[in-house]
Design a protein with these regions (language model features):
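Cytosolic regulatory regions built on CNB/CRP/Popeye-like sensor folds
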Residues: 1-245
């Protein structure tokens, strides 16, 4: 289609030439962490076939200012940014919010309270979610467990840790979590604990999957790639966290 194009990228500067997300089909691009956040320790993350470049930036209309290095020509499928944004805007409110939330996390920005989403979520799923209470310091789920569903924080706060128990994020009222494992069909890769006594709403895994199945292929593509991208960015961040209590 006129919105997608196979391209051969020979120079890293060409990656930033258009308002487009790039899906790698062959080759490797390297991202140094100092291009992402300030750190005195330097590590590099590889992006290869099956990964995307500038997807989060394109979806959120941010500057394409993360600097990649390529040592060999990179084969990509380029997808027009305006087409991607329109597809996501027309997605169901839950899928749209999942994508927006993931972009926020990729940029390591603090989640903001979202009362509009909360109202719509509570109204839309009032007969579907299961309520639960979790006491302070109790686990909500642990690494390796199969996903039960998406969790919405009605009251309280939680914190996330890596498999090595390095704490890396906190989430608060109106935030949600746990959707990544559902979308990527994997077991839990993080631990989540209650930071204080919490009231949670659990939206069953099958309901989330049903929402996703009704979306157009382009939205499904964005969903799978945005979580892959979040995982790659987390690997870059976690390389500085190992062993931190």
């Amino acid at each position: 289609s006129k919105y997608t194009e196979k391209r051969l990228i020979s120079y890293a500067s060409e990656l930033q030439a258009r308002d487009a997300a790039l899906f790698i089909t062959k080759g490797v691009a390297l991202l140094r962490d100092h291009s992402v956040f300030d750190t005195t320790i330097h590590s590099t993350q590889s992006f290869s076939a099956g990964d995307s470049i500038y997807l989060a930036a394109t979806l959120s209309k941010r500057r394409l200012d993360r600097n990649y290095t390529i040592h060999e020509p990179l084969e990509v499928v380029s997808v027009d940014g305006s087409v991607l944004r329109k597809a996501v805007m027309n997605a169901s409110f839950l899928v749209n919010e999942i994508i927006r939330n993931s972009v926020t996390r990729i940029y390591a920005n603090k989640q903001r309270a979202n009362p509009v989403f909360e109202d719509r979520f509570l109204l839309h799923y009032k007969d579907s979610f299961k309520k639960s209470s979790v006491r302070k310091d109790q686990p909500i789920f642990l690494v390796g467990e199969p996903p039960k569903g998406l969790y919405f924080i009605a009251k309280g706060s939680v914190f996330l840790t890596t498999e090595e128990h390095a704490k890396f994020a906190e989430l608060y009222e109106t935030d949600f979590f746990g959707e990544g494992s559902i979308i990527t069909s994997t077991n839990r890769s993080k631990n989540v604990y209650a930071m204080e006594d919490c009231s949670l709403l659990l939206l069953d895994k099958q309901l989330v999957l049903d929402e996703i199945r009704s979306e157009i292929p382009l939205v499904k593509l964005v969903l799978s790639h945005i979580f892959n991208l979040l995982e790659l960015m987390n690997q870059l961040r976690f390389s500085h966290l190992e062993g931190v209590a």
